[in-house]
């Protein structure tokens, strides 16, 4: 068989699915749209800063809406970006470690490039004109003030001249996380406080008070924690009750788990805690912690836990005392890889902190609830001279301090709202790393739109929609967008409601993307409704940003059901007319008894594809059913063996939520097999010709990387034309070569005769003569 057709057969064998009926996989949990990095750039929906040549680790973000700037801490640098466009008006501060510090770090056995540098870990607003920044300082933490000016017009961005010791504010090791927040001139930070990375603590530094921290070397307080975030949440209208909440994960305390495990935690501190008088001096006296549970109940009573807390976002509500907490978790197991998002209410958290304390008791010294008398005031309560008469924690009785020291953990865990995650991902090749949430006003209510970063450089846009009640939520994955040029973990995310933009940080750079891309959903009312994006609605002419104003009553939107038949039924004929006008027409050719693949892929990954066939000269259309010869796939229609009766027009339709859209009209012409010899008539290929080997390789590459659906037809046509051209060129070259050789031979013979005649004339008296020989040209 001709080598080209062997290659065609090989390629179709590779791309064709297994024989038999292929069941449609569930599409409810896949993103409706999945644009690539290139598509995001080409659609002007992504701006990227690809990093500095001598820097990396763009992990620390500080969003300043008033100045319109995004401050980013990286390796040896602090950067300032314009919120409108991160590639416009960039500012840079270089803050490397001193050569002596780098040498000391190197002599300690640390990596010069990855560890012996100043990795910025803390960026907090200090006052109206300055930021407070801290870095690892090549394993010698250092802090300084950064002047940014009072207004953006000041165009000020410079590092202060005085530096402070960063111990208790920034970790020594750049691989360790730090959670920090600057409140009323005091810095609350969860970090490591020693060179070896073993002394983890929650610190309060700066301000007019003495620094304070958690108890040292006591695993009941902290057991090798990894801090995630710090938040101030008011407890009541009385400022004396304000509490600081810390989110972290740590190793389970002995006895909590049979094997070594990680638990997610929430910890609380009173803002007005100044330590004890005789015990716990300069140590927290109001520190309590509880386990955060995010699990899926099992049928056999064994729950599947997501214990690795990765990120936390607080969604503000009308009541500042009761924000909704969104938390991202991953699994600890190396076998089972998954991610989840759970929601928590402050009411449930406060109920746990008012519940029983964890206490070791019994013959096995296991953890049980403490049921004896609890000293007054209850440990964990903030001092208040208004209610309990204690002006400071230094006034607490000794039994309160002693109890607080030995009972920092609560017995009951905090369960998520509805006792179930709102999002679970276990069948994907990525894990969640970051989350931000935006509350969006839609036509039928408010929705929280989640933007979730992954460890593969993608962002998921997800909205939770109530099926019947708010206790039964449906996860709708709108988009999965690639926002970095290569797979890399997203380690920082900030959302600007003013600019309606999302900012993302990673080890290799910073990216910016809009919160909504309504124009990409399509040009029809039905496509806009099918998107179920709370940001978008059909305005009568296009899918555009939805604004909840009384003047725009013609907006069409259905987030809860996504039903285009109810929202756009009166526009169906208009959409169909537009669809017919913009329908893609293609013509392809196939050879009888060979294979052919008709490619058709819908924009929406949730759409189902079906095909119709119309013979030439007929009006009615027949639906194509998959069988042994014809196989429908998600990428198109594969006809294993073409017949003459397969010639005709093929229609590719996408069906989603009852809405049918025609994507492609394709005309297939089948060439009879008896014409094949005439079309492909040529000499057998010379396998010893190196040029022919190159043709084999080029033809093979063209087949395995087709530029278009009918690339095989185009390739065959190119090969036929090329071979005919080569035959003509070969014949012309042979004829020209023969003519040229005859001319040279004739000329050479004439020249030889003339030369011989001249030699005979000159050398008649010579005794010797040279041997006569033909010229080399002959």
From Swiss-Prot:
Disulfide bonds join 105-116, 134-143, 270-382, 294-342, 518-536, 652-716. Residues 735-751 have a biased composition (Polar residues). GO terms for cellular component: axon; extracellular space; glutamatergic synapse; plasma membrane. GO terms for biological process: branching involved in blood vessel morphogenesis; branching morphogenesis of a nerve; morphogenesis of a branching structure; motor neuron axon guidance; negative chemotaxis; neural crest cell migration; positive regulation of cell migration; semaphorin-plexin signaling pathway. It is found in: Secreted. Residues 32-515 form the Sema domain. Residues 727-778 are annotated as: Disordered. Glycans are attached at residues 54, 127, 593. PROSITE patterns: IG_LIKE, SEMA. Keywords: Developmental protein, Differentiation, Disulfide bond, Glycoprotein, Immunoglobulin domain, Neurogenesis, Secreted, Signal. Residues 1-17 form the signal peptide. Residues 579-668 form the Ig-like C2-type domain. InterPro entries: Ig-like_dom (IPR007110), Ig-like_dom_sf (IPR036179), Ig-like_fold (IPR013783), Ig_sub (IPR003599), PSI (IPR016201), Semap_dom (IPR001627), Semap_dom_sf (IPR036352), Semaphorin (IPR027231). Residues 756-778 have a biased composition (Basic and acidic residues). Belongs to the semaphorin family. Might normally influence the midsegmental pathway choice of the ventrally extending motor axons by contributing to a repulsive domain in the posterior somite. This is Semaphorin-3ab. It comes from Danio rerio (Zebrafish).
């Amino acid at each position: 068989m001709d080598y080209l057709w062997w290659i065609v057969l090989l390629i179709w064998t590779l791309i064709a699915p297994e024989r038999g009926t292929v069941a449609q996989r569930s599409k409810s949990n896949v993103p409706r749209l999945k644009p690539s990095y290139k598509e995001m750039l080409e659609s002007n929906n992504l701006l990227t800063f690809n990093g500095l040549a001598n820097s990396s680790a763009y992990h620390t973000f500080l969003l300043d809406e008033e100045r319109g700037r995004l401050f980013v801490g990286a390796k040896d640098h602090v950067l300032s970006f314009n919120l409108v466009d991160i590639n416009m008006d960039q500012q840079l501060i270089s803050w490397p470690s001193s050569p002596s510090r780098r040498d000391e770090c190197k002599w300690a056995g640390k990596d010069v490039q990855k560890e012996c540098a100043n990795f910025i870990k803390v960026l907090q607003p200090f006052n109206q004109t300055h930021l407070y920044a801290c870095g690892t300082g090549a394993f010698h933490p250092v802090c300084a003030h950064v002047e940014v000016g009072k207004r953006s017009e000041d165009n000020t961005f410079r590092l202060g001249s005085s530096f402070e010791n960063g111990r208790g504010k920034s970790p020594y090791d750049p691989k360790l996380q730090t959670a920090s927040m600057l409140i009323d001139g005091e810095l609350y930070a969860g970090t490591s406080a020693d060179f070896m990375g073993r002394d983890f603590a929650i610190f309060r530094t700066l301000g007019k008070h003495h620094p304070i921290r958690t108890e040292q070397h006591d695993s009941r307080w902290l057991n090798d924690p990894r801090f995630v975030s710090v938040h101030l949440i008011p407890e009541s209208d009385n400022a004396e009750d304000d509490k600081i909440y810390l989110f972290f994960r740590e190793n389970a305390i002995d006895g909590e788990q049979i094997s070594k495990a990680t638990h997610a935690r929430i910890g609380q501190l009173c803002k007005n805690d100044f330590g004890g008088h005789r015990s716990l001096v300069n140590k927290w006296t109001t520190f309590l912690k509880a386990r955060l549970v995010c699990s899926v109940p099992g049928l056999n009573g064994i729950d599947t836990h997501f214990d690795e807390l990765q990120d936390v976002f607080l969604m503000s509500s009308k009541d500042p005392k009761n924000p909704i907490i969104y938390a991202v978790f991953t699994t600890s197991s190396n076998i089972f890889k998954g991610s989840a998002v759970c929601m928590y209410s402050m009411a449930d958290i406060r109920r746990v902190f008012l519940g029983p304390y964890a206490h070791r008791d019994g013959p096995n010294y296991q953890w049980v609830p403490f049921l004896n008398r609890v000293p007054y005031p209850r440990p964990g309560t903030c001092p208040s001279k208004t209610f309990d008469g204690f002006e400071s924690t230094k006034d607490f009785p000794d039994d309160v301090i002693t109890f607080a020291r030995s009972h920092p953990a609560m017995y009951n865990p905090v369960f998520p709202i509805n006792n179930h995650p709102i999002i679970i991902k276990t069948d994907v090749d990525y894990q969640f790393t970051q989350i931000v949430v935006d509350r969006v006003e839609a036509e039928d209510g408010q929705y929280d739109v989640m933007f979730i970063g992954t460890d593969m450089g993608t962002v998921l846009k997800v909205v939770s929609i109530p099926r019947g009640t708010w206790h039964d939520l449906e996860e709708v994955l709108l988009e999965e967008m690639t926002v970095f040029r290569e797979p890399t973990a997203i380690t920082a995310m900030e959302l600007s409601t003013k600019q309606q933009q999302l900012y993302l940080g990673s080890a290799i750079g910073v990216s910016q993307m809009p919160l909504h891309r309504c124009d990409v959903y399509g040009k029809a009312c039905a496509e806009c409704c099918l998107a179920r994006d709370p940001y978008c609605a059909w305005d009568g002419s296009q899918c555009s940003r939805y604004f909840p104003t009384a003047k725009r009553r013609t907006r069409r939107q259905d987030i809860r059901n996504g039903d285009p038949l109810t929202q756009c039924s009166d526009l169906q004929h208009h959409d169909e007319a537009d669809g017919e006008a913009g329908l893609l027409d293609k013509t392809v050719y196939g050879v009888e008894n060979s294979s052919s693949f008709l490619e058709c892929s819908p924009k929406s990954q949730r759409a189902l594809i079906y095909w119709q066939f119309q013979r030439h000269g007929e009006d009615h259309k027949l639906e194509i059913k998959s069988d042994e010869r014809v196989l429908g796939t998600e990428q198109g229609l594969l006809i294993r063996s073409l017949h003459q009766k397969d010639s005709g027009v093929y229609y590719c339709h996408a069906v989603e939520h009852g809405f049918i859209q025609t994507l492609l009209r394709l005309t297939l012409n089948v060439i009879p097999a008896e014409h094949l010899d005439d079309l492909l008539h040529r000499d057998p290929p010379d396998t010893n010709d190196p040029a022919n080997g190159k043709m084999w390789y080029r033809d093979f590459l063209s087949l395995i990387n087709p530029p278009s659906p009918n690339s095989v037809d185009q390739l065959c046509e190119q090969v036929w034309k090329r071979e005919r051209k080569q035959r003509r060129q070969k014949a012309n070259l042979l004829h020209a070569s023969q003519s040229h050789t005859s001319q040279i031979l004739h000329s050479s013979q004439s020249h030889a005769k003339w030369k011989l005649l001249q030699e005979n004339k000159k050398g008649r008296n010579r005794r010797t003569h040279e041997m006569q020989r033909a010229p080399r040209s002959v």
